[in-house]
């Protein structure tokens, strides 16, 4: 019986001469026949690259045997063995080529070469051979190398023995005994490690016996052998659960004494796989944290943290006491490492350690403010604020302290971070009503130093919605009045400008009265004078004046009248609420009068020339509406009804909307983070009893590390193991018609980075098709690895070929080709054109999630945009959104509660997806119902870093329309 062997691994080789014209076979032959060793080396490199690109170069085999194989040059010999790896060793009938007999003799001589490096390189080459006819002649020489004096030879010899046995057991029927004997007698650690790996794969009982014999000395063994022991224990414990407890004790001892980083990581990982005991998990994860702190490679840090996150998800609640230890990783400079550590710590925070965590994060936040000039300091600060926000919302006891902490830093934060702080304050005042009074007091005290208009608008909304008592309303009003500054704004600013102009004129007159001519310094030299000094001084003066202005006045004079419109709404809310909670009519009238004065002053200054940008129509309309509400003196019979409508619009509706949105978001977060949801099982899932089940591998949980390895190799295809036959039937594409002389169909299998075409060819004629071959070519970022070789197909015969197409991006790709075979009786070759195969873009696009800040950053950074106008006869806006999500495979970032009701007439949302190649795709949907035609009209804007992905997704939107026959799409 032939042992199962792994498929060969391929190496990606960079071709440095892609733009040059490739050499012909004759040129290669001439270079090998008459060139020097250096010329032969360059020729061999080009030959290897050419063969790896799909051209087998069969004419070169004899020339290489004649002119390269006898050479003594070490570099040439190394390239020669690379050539032996990839050269076709079998003919079309599947038999060994005659030329390979000469190659076998040369390999045997190298196995007996006095140079140990040549022997070792030759033995390593044997591990890559899969032809029993070739290996059969190498067995005696390979066994002789097991006793060679140099360990470099022996370490490859034992691997060659293992490889030969896996290819064909009858070549080395006693391989298990050979490896076991070699292991017992060997002293070199690398050789012992290779031998033990081979023994554990072929003979589990002897490997276990060797492990038991060395248990007492395991702490002093070489790290390579220790790692091999850990690998064996991890796999064997899954197959023999009865030994798990003993294995765990052994691994704990090894974990405590191991010094090599690799052994520590592998041992800790094995413990977390074999045991769910909290004590064991804490010891293992503690070692992993120490490793993440100690190593300098950021990739290693992220790998270790990923493993810790997986452990925490599989064992919720077991790692809580390690929260502060994980935060030690924040000493790293890489933002991705810090983000991963904070994400894990967020899941581990409890009421017992919350205060310590907040204190540590506070120190980190202070450090970012002190080291503000450092690169990525602002990104890290935003990350810390986001983490602190998430913690405070969960724990009421520290929410007030955290609000005060973040408001203390708001002056030093950029616009995005400051807006995040205000959004957090908004959540806290809604979630914890008992803290509102103190939070409003702190907020009002810190608003004077806020420089971000967006953050200030959020603060105004908070003041308008949550100032509910008479004293709170008056405090908020005082701040607004101080923030506006002296009013009327226009007259005050003009007065200040005239005063400043007078001072400048006086200074000019004084300078004019001074003696003209050069200025002589005390040392007798002439002083220099900057011709631009006066203009620079003017700019500095204006900048200082702008900074000294209060916030609202600065925003208004800067042309930010959107903030002014928010101020107008806030003033109306404060007046209406004061009217409800207070009976002091004089104070109410004073508030109305002062509010009118502020709003009218803003409109007047917005229409003047002293602002940087005049007021826009929308903002002016909103401010005018607020003025009309404050001046309302309508019919007393209608005043109660109108007042009720105003109260609903300004005091109840917006707050109720925010509260509903907040509750919905909270429910969504709780549902997503629920441990029950993460570890749920089907209600009808069968219960497995180990003592009653048959001795097969189907009931045993797999090795998590091996599963991760399969995911890395095959991508998401490794997950989809169910209904393989059904899924393959859906992927069959006809390449020719039934009336063609050759019928062809392809089964398309999509992997993470390639597409495999399994093509079935049927000769429908009564003649033998000679020199029959299939040729494929591609359009787009696709590349054919190798076209299938020519063959002969008998009448009504079948032939199968497999073609691998490498995919390097998520752009639309097309595979086309033809079938060529010789015509009969001296006729020309005949062709059959194949149908085009379109690579499905959706196989490489996956829905993803990101925060609003990252989405906006990418939206501004990406330069390629595809804007598509939409007209649809679908019944609702949500129906079109569902079709778009289904067709583009993108995820919606906008919260569900913000999308509106099912019968809404306007819908705007953001969508996001990532490709298997790390490409980001952003989309913005903005649609509405046309009041005349009741059709869905609007735009879809798609942005990406590269042009191809944006165009491909745009084509996908158009394709959805054609398939649906309900949507009419036009490109802009």
Curated annotation (Swiss-Prot):
Q: Which Gene3D superfamilies match?
A: Leucine-rich Repeat Variant
Q: Which UniProt keywords apply?
A: Cytoplasm, Cytoplasmic vesicle, ER-Golgi transport, Golgi apparatus, Membrane, Protein transport, Repeat, Transport
Give any single GO term for biological process.
intra-Golgi vesicle-mediated transport
Q: Which SUPFAM superfamilies does its entry note?
A: ARM repeat
One Pfam annotation reads Coatomer_b_Cpla
Q: What is the recorded function of this protein according to its Swiss-Prot or TrEMBL entry?
A: The coatomer is a cytosolic protein complex that binds to dilysine motifs and reversibly associates with Golgi non-clathrin-coated vesicles, which further mediate biosynthetic protein transport from the ER, via the Golgi up to the trans Golgi network. Coatomer complex is required for budding from Golgi membranes, and is essential for the retrograde Golgi-to-ER transport of dilysine-tagged proteins.
- What this protein is called in its record is Coatomer subunit beta
Give the organism, scientific name. Candida glabrata (strain ATCC 2001 / BCRC 20586 / JCM 3761 / NBRC 0622 / NRRL Y-65 / CBS 138) (Yeast)
């Amino acid at each position: 019986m032939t042992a199962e062997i792994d498929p060969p691994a391929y190496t990606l080789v960079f071709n440095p001469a892609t733009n040059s014209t490739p050499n012909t076979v004759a040129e290669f032959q001439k270079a090998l026949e008459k060139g020097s060793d250096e010329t032969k080396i360059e020729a061999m490199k080009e030959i290897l690259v050419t063969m790896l690109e799909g051209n087998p170069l069969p004419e070169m085999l004899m020339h290489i045997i004649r002119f390269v194989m006898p050479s003594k040059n070490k570099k040439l010999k190394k390239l020669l063995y690379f050539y032996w790896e990839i050269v076709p060793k079998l003919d079309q009938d599947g038999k060994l080529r005659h030329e390979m007999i000469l190659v076998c003799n040369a390999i045997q001589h190298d196995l007996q070469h006095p140079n140990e490096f040549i022997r070792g390189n030759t033995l390593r080459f044997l591990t890559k051979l899969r032809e029993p006819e070739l290996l059969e002649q190498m067995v005696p020489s390979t066994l002789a190398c097991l006793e060679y004096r140099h360990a470099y030879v022996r370490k490859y010899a034992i691997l060659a023995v293992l490889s030969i046995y896996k290819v064909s057991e009858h070549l080395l029927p006693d391989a298990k005994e050979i490896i076991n004997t070699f292991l017992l007698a060997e002293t070199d650690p690398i050789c012992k490690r290779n031998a033990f790996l081979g023994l554990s794969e072929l003979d589990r009982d002897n490997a276990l016996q060797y492990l038991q014999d060395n248990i007492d000395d395991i702490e002093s063994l070489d790290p390579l052998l220790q790692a091999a022991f850990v690998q064996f224990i991890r796999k064997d414990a899954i197959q023999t659960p009865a030994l798990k407890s003993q294995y765990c004790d052994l691994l704990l001892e090894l974990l405590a004494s191991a010094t090599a980083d690799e052994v520590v990581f592998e041992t800790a990982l094995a413990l977390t796989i074999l045991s769910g005991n909290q004590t064991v998990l804490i010891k293992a994860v503690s070692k992993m944290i120490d490793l993440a702190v100690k190593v300098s490679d950021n990739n290693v840090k992220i790998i270790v943290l990923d493993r810790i996150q997986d452990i925490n998800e599989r064992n919720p609640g077991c790692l809580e006491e390690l929260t502060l230890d994980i935060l030690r990783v924040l000493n790293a400079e890489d933002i991705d490492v810090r983000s991963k550590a904070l994400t894990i710590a967020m899941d581990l925070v409890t009421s017992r350690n919350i205060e310590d965590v907040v204190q540590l994060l506070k120190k980190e936040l202070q450090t970012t403010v002190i080291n503000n000039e450092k690169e990525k300091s602002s990104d890290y600060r935003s990350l810390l604020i986001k983490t602190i926000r998430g913690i405070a919302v969960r724990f009421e006891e520290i929410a007030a302290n955290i609000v005060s902490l973040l408001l203390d830093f708001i002056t030093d934060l950029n616009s995005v971070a400051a807006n995040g702080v205000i959004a957090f304050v908004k959540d806290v005042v809604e979630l914890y009503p008992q803290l509102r009074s103190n939070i409003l007091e702190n907020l009002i005290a810190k608003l004077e130093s806020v420089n971000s208009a967006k953050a200030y608008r959020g603060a105004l909304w908070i003041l308008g919605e949550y100032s509910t008592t008479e004293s709170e309303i008056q405090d908020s009003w005082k701040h607004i009045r101080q923030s506006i500054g002296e009013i009327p704004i226009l007259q005050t600013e003009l007065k200040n400008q005239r005063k400043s102009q007078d001072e400048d004129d006086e200074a000019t007159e004084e300078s004019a009265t001074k003696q003209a001519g050069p200025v002589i310094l005390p040392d007798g030299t002439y002083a220099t004078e900057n011709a631009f000094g006066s203009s620079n001084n003017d700019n500095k003066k204006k900048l200082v004046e702008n900074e000294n202005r209060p916030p609202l006045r600065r925003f208004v004079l800067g042309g930010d009248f959107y903030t002014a419109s928010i101020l107008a709404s806030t003033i109306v809310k404060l007046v209406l609420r004061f009217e409800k909670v207070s009976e002091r009519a004089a104070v109410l009238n004073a508030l109305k009068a002062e509010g009118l004065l502020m709003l009218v002053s803003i409109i007047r200054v917005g229409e003047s020339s002293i602002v940087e940008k005049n007021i826009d129509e929308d903002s002016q309309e909103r401010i005018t509406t607020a003025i009309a509400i404050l001046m309302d003196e309508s019919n007393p019979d209608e005043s109660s009804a109108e007042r009720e409508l105003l109260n609903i619009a300004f005091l109840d509706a917006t707050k109720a909307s925010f509260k509903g949105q907040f509750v919905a978001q909270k429910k969504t977060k709780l549902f997503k983070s629920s441990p029950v949801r993460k570890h749920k099982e089907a209600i009808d899932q069968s219960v497995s009893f180990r003592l009653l089940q048959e001795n097969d591998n189907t009931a045993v949980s797999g090795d998590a590390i091996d599963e991760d390895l399969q995911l890395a190799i095959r991508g998401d295809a490794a997950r989809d193991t169910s209904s393989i036959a059904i899924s393959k039937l859906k992927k069959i594409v006809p390449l020719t018609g039934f009336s063609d002389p050759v019928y062809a169909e392809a089964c398309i299998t999509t992997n993470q980075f390639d597409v495999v075409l399994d093509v079935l060819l049927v000769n429908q004629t009564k003649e033998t098709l000679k020199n029959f071959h299939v040729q494929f070519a591609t359009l787009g970022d696709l590349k054919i690895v190798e076209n299938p070789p020519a063959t002969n197909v008998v009448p009504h015969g079948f032939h199968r070929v497999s073609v691998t197409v490498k995919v390097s991006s998520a752009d639309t790709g097309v595979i086309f080709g033809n079938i060529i075979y010789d015509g009969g009786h001296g006729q020309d070759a005949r062709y059959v054109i194949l149908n085009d195969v379109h690579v499905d873009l959706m196989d490489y696009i996956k829905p993803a999630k990101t925060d609003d800040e990252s989405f906006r950053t990418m939206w501004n950074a990406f330069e390629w945009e595809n804007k598509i106008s939409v007209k649809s006869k679908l019944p609702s806006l949500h129906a079109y959104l569902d079709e778009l999500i289904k067709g583009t495979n993108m995820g919606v970032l906008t919260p569900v509660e913000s999308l509106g009701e099912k019968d809404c007439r306007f819908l705007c949302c953001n969508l996001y997806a990532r490709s298997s190649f790390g490409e980001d795709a952003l989309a913005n949907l903005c649609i509405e119902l046309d009041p005349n035609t009741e059709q869905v009209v609007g735009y879809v804007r798609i942005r990406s870093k590269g042009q191809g992905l944006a165009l491909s997704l745009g084509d996908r939107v158009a394709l959805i329309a054609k398939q649906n026959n309900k949507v009419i799409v036009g490109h802009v």
